[in-house]
């Protein structure tokens, strides 16, 4: 792997993780805030709220995982390496 | 009116055994009974809530196992054994990831104020292992890891039937 490809891969990996985590991070924060507020207002609905939160977190966090996987592939199994 | 006759002596017996029958005679006693009733109902409801969440996790786990078995069978039949092993490894990682996520969400608001990120180690470790072992393929393992998504969707679709069954 030549030096330009290596440098571009490292930069791309950092960008993939960093940019990919911004959106889900904001979304997860607001979802957790809403869930905790909902549990505080309606403790009897705690089970349902936690279940819905699990579902939404699993789907939101997969966006972060996509970025993480792309970064790891670029670093450890780079398809552009010579 | 056999049911009425049968039910009333049982309740009076239970009351006299707990000493509640005597308490009901006075005002103070009835207040105490109300308080203890409230406590009992709140304990029962919190127990129900946590068990509801645990039951949900158990249902997701079962559906995930079924979807994994189906996907591994299909990949053995139509692709090859290495792809099936990669898929199985990925699916196993997905189950661990979802378990960690559920654990973090379960502790949200109780012991921690934010959801931890420890579960993200699982896909990272999966990719690293797959990249190091030449027999394993990356794409099937990622597909296997993401099998928790159809499981969640199936659970969400089947939830009304499960509620009807339990309720």
Curated annotation (Swiss-Prot), chain A:
Any one Gene Ontology MF annotation carried by this entry is: proton-transporting ATP synthase activity, rotational mechanism
The taxonomy runs: Bacteria, Bacillati, Cyanobacteriota, Cyanophyceae, Synechococcales
Looking at the UniProt record, the site noted as Reversibly protonated during proton transport sits at 61
Against NCBIfam families, the record matches this protein to:
ATP_synt_c, PRK07354.1
**Coiled-coil region(s) at which residues?**
none
Keyword Zinc-finger attributed = no
What is the gene name? atpE
Tell me, how does this one assemble?
A: F-type ATPases have 2 components, F(1) - the catalytic core - and F(0) - the membrane proton channel. F(1) has five subunits: alpha(3), beta(3), gamma(1), delta(1), epsilon(1). F(0) has four main subunits: a(1), b(1), b'(1) and c(10-14). The alpha and beta chains form an alternating ring which encloses part of the gamma chain. F(1) is attached to F(0) by a central stalk formed by the gamma and epsilon chains, while a peripheral stalk is formed by the delta, b and b' chains.
Q: Which source organism?
A: Prochlorococcus marinus (strain MIT 9211)
Q: How does it sit in the membrane?
A: Multi-pass membrane protein
Keyword Transmembrane attached:
yes
Q: What's a GO cellular component annotated to this UniProt protein?
A: proton-transporting ATP synthase complex
What are the protein's UniProt keywords? ATP synthesis, CF(0), Hydrogen ion transport, Ion transport, Lipid-binding, Membrane, Thylakoid, Transmembrane, Transmembrane helix, Transport
Q: Which residues cross the membrane?
A: 7-27, 57-77
PROSITE patterns this protein is in? ATPASE_C
Give the protein's recorded name. ATP synthase subunit c
